[in-house]
């Protein structure tokens, strides 16, 4: 179940009616940039359902949209938003780290110094511009985000 409060905890509303039911909520990540925007990942381990379930809501959970894009069909564990660019999202799955630079339409498997293993936790260290990734049994990794931010910058186009 996913619940939201808009009055400091005075009352709560359930907001998961537009999501697959009977699935574990593996992560919830509110946007730092847009009020009412929230990301959620679910998994179906209990039912041998390893489908990708990653969603966003822009209206406090009244409606949900899949942002699976071109992701492969695999369980996902955590999603977080970048601290500089709201279009960049990081998704930890059972087989590695995926990054989108367009809000979830197109995802790419991170090809850096990170093994393709289950990722269960992530946090951004804004001062250092690093993504800290916690894996299942393969340690903790620190990824410098400067290159990802550079890739996401608009490029000057030259018309011929």
List each model region and its residues.
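Beta-propeller blade termini and top-face loops
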Residues: 1-160
């Amino acid at each position: 179940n996913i619940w939201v409060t808009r009055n400091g905890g005075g009352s709560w509303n359930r907001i998961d009616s537009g999501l697959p039911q009977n699935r574990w909520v593996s992560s919830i990540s509110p946007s730092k940039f847009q009020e009412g925007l929230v990301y959620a990942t679910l998994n179906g381990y209990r039912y041998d359902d390893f489908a990708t379930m990653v969603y966003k809501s822009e209206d406090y959970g009244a409606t949900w949209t899949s942002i699976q894009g071109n992701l492969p069909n695999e369980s996902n564990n955590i999603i977080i938003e970048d601290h500089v660019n709201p279009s960049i999202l990081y998704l930890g799955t059972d087989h590695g780290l995926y990054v989108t630079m367009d809000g979830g339409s197109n995802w790419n498997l991170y090809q850096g110094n990170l093994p393709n293993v289950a990722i269960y936790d992530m946090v951004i260290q804004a001062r250092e511009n690093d993504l800290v990734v916690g894996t299942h049994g393969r340690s903790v990794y620190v990824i410098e985000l400067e290159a990802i931010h550079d890739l996401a910058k608009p490029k000057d186009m030259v018309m011929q």
